[in-house]
Amino acid sequence: MIERPIPGADAPIGIFDSGVGGLTVARTIIDQLPHESIIYIGDTANGPYGPLPIARVREHALRIADELVERGCKMIVIACNTASAAFLRDARERYDVPVVEVILPAVRRAVAATRNGKVGVIGTVGTINSGAYQDLFAASPSIEVHAAACPRFVDFVERGITSGRQILNIAEGYLEPLQAQGVDTLVLGCTHYPLLSGVIQLAMGDHVTLVSSAEETAKDVLRILSQNDLLADPTMHPTPTYSFESTGDPELFSQLSRRFLGPVVTQIRHNMV
């Protein structure tokens, strides 16, 4: 375990993803915990993580999480399903700050949401092949799980393409087998995918409930910070600070971050981690 001075409640929350997808989680945390400061790192130089070998994903995630801990973050949020599947156990053994991931929160929400017991899961190749979702759903034996990889979705989001006939056609191809299985609940098992929720909903139909882990993850962040007496005190630090950083092209990351997050993004820092 890496031992550092225990951060106080005024320390930032560290969030990372392979790119812009984790901004969906950051946005929800900002909305639900408006007094918390945040450092967000998008590893665009090495992402997307989905097609990479698990060992490589673990290597990239380790490097970024180490930096966030070194910079005094009081909590690490792995805002990437592929990295959560590859790195969660290592992270919780390595760091003495709380580590929150995005897979279990989505599973909890899907189990509560389904009406017919048939749940679909879509994600990157790495996430689907890891079996992480399937393993967690196994704790609810009444749930029938159908999984499908949607490898091209992340690339579209990273290029800022979130609607249009081309992406809809691709979505329909990916999702048709899940429709055929009669799923009534679909887990968006990649933090990029909520940015395609309009297209995915159109392809699946209005009768299917889409589950994003962002809302449930933010609830976990609130609960764990509260349990550890780490919630920021707005009377002591009324104005939170936000740092959004990219290991790759900062200009493209800046454009997408401002589009997805709005005015909270004032400057993008190029991080050479």
UniProtKB/Swiss-Prot annotation:
Residue numbers annotated as active site: C80, C190
PROSITE patterns (alphabetical): ASP_GLU_RACEMASE_1, ASP_GLU_RACEMASE_2
Alphabetized UniProt keyword annotations: Cell shape, Cell wall biogenesis/degradation, Isomerase, Peptidoglycan synthesis
Catalytic activity: L-glutamate = D-glutamate
Keyword Kinase: no
GO MF annotations in UniProt: glutamate racemase activity
EC id: 5.1.1.3
Positions with a binding annotation for substrate: D17, S18, Y49, G50, N81, T82, T191, H192
InterPro entries, alphabetized: Asp/Glu/hydantoin_racemase (IPR015942), Asp/Glu_race (IPR001920), Asp/Glu_racemase_AS_1 (IPR018187), Asp/Glu_racemase_AS_2 (IPR033134), Glu_race (IPR004391)
A Pfam family it matches: Asp_Glu_race
Enzyme class, first EC level, given as a word: isomerase
Pathway field: Cell wall biogenesis; peptidoglycan biosynthesis
GO BP annotation list: cell wall organization; peptidoglycan biosynthetic process; regulation of cell shape
Superkingdom, natural source: Bacteria
Coiled-coil regions, chain positions: none
PANTHER family attached to this UniProt entry: GLUTAMATE RACEMASE
Function: Provides the (R)-glutamate required for cell wall biosynthesis.
HAMAP family, per database record: Glu_racemase
Membership in a protein family: Belongs to the aspartate/glutamate racemases family.
Protein name: Glutamate racemase
Organism this protein belongs to: Corynebacterium efficiens (strain DSM 44549 / YS-314 / AJ 12310 / JCM 11189 / NBRC 100395)
Lineage: Bacteria, Bacillati, Actinomycetota, Actinomycetes, Mycobacteriales
